[in-house]
Amino acid sequence: MLKKQDGDLLQLEILMIVLGAVLLVLCILVIVIFPPGDTPKAPEPTEPAPTFAAPEPNPYGPEDFAEVNGYLACVTGPYSMGVDVSEFHGAINWEKAKNAGVSFVFIRVGGRGWGQEGRLYPDSKAQEYYEGAKAAGLQVGAYFFSQAVTVTEALEEANYTLDLIEGWELDLPVVYDWEYVNASARTAKVRARDLTDCTLAFCDAIQDAGHEAMVYFNVSQGRDLLYLEELTIYPFWLAMYESPMNYQYEVEYWQYTRFGSVPGIPGNADINLRLPKRPIV
């Protein structure tokens, strides 16, 4: 009988030791997982994601335009005609262009190469074009041909543009002109989020420097590669060729052809219409 009691006591002692060891292990685990002063906290409420309104609908339609004297014209309200130029146009006679109806010009001041190096370069004719257009009494804006793939590059382009237009008295915006080149270009895999951020970075920097900024794009780019609702603080310049004006959103400038003929400008000319804001009927 005593031996049985001794055995029972021994088993009880072993059980107590095992339970104590288990409790010790559990305590250690709690301390490791939740160190003192680092108790679990309820998740902090997050701010709702910003929402953006869609761009304003386009108040212009196909019925507002017709050909007049060889050029597309808005026949239902005021408008003005202009061109955009780069060094590839060679020597320009601005007086002849003005007499043909051109009232404004956007001058390319520089660009970034679409090869992998992505080098920045100035337009060799920009200063000459600026002085000639100003002397002829035309309104002048500027544009930069971008191939940025990051916000850092877009800011580099903005600062480069500001250096190139230093001393210019611009009447019109400084334009961010990012274009898809081809499948082998450094920009071929840029996503909409990346390009929208690049566009905002460039335009914000231009605006912060005291200039008006504007965004240039074509129909497919505006649909697939830009979140236009995030860019509505800046005016839009749309490239839509050989087509009636049926774009859904309001644009301030419409580049309606790449193959125009303008006296004083050698070769093909990009022709644009400036369309004033007006109420939707």
What are these regions, as identified by a protein language model?
Residues 75-201, 207-209:
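Substrate-binding cleft of extracellular glycoside hydrolase catalytic domains
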Residues 29-42:
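Hydrophobic single-pass membrane-insertion segments
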Residues 140, 212-214, 236:
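Hydrophobic anchor at the start of a short beta-strand
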